[in-house]
Amino acid sequence: MALDNKFVAKGLRLYSARSVANRTKTFVAKKNKVVAPKKVVAPVTPVEKTFGKGKRVIAAKASKFAPSIPAEIRSTAAKKVQQKVALRKSITPGTVLIILAGRFAGKRVVALKQLDSGLILITGPFKVNGVPLRRIDQRYVIATSTKIDVSSVKVAATINDAYFAAEKKSTTKSEGAFFSDEKKAEKKKIADSRVADQKSVDSAILAVLKKEKFLTVYLKTKFYLKKGEFPHQLKF
């Protein structure tokens, strides 16, 4: 008969683990544990049966029950399928966007294209308002009615999601660095290839901006709401 070891308080039972073991004598059963011999499974040979005029080899019969050993269960790992993100109809290549959050909140930028991850590739240009080539989610931008002709802008195929992937930092530290009191913040050096990519994209956009009179000033001006203005009442 099982021992009724009920709770007397939250997380506290009437008998301790030692008391339960002494009362039920579970240690005796563990000491005198009988190990059952392993069953030797006989190899299954295919059986040949006659059906009418012909003969057929019957394969091994499938097991009636599911395997109890985890190694025998076939793993069904889910395949990661990246679904295509639908872009808003108001966002097209060349659309001027207003960034709503982050480091460049309020800046006006130019949308270049949609990447495979669904994020939008944007640029300031950097020479105009200091916004470099970046990725941004469409939920953090407002699409304006202003559009720039970016048909002459050629974005390299290398500028993709892997282009913006962050480098993995090493977690191991030397003994001197671990015990040092002063921590010098090293300035991250931008690769020459990234600088060249930024210049090639910006030069094509700046050539288009020269043709329009107020576009450069428009992109330089930061967006903000004045007193009495509400974003849902504005036409962008």
Swiss-Prot record:
GO molecular function: RNA binding; structural constituent of ribosome
CC per GO annotation: cytosolic large ribosomal subunit; extracellular matrix
InterPro entries listed in its UniProt record: 60S_ribosomal_eL6 (IPR000915), Rib_uL2_dom2 (IPR014722), Ribosomal_eL6_CS (IPR049633), Ribosomal_eL6_KOW (IPR041997), Translation_prot_SH3-like_sf (IPR008991)
CDD domains xref list: KOW_RPL6 (cd13156)
Keyword annotations from UniProtKB, A to Z: Ribonucleoprotein, Ribosomal protein
Example of a GO biological process term: cytoplasmic translation
Pfam families, sorted: Ribosomal_L6e
Family the UniProt entry places it in: Belongs to the eukaryotic ribosomal protein eL6 family.
Designated name of the protein: Large ribosomal subunit protein eL6
Species in which this protein is naturally found: Dictyostelium discoideum
Lineage: Eukaryota, Amoebozoa, Evosea, Eumycetozoa, Dictyostelia
Gene: rpl6
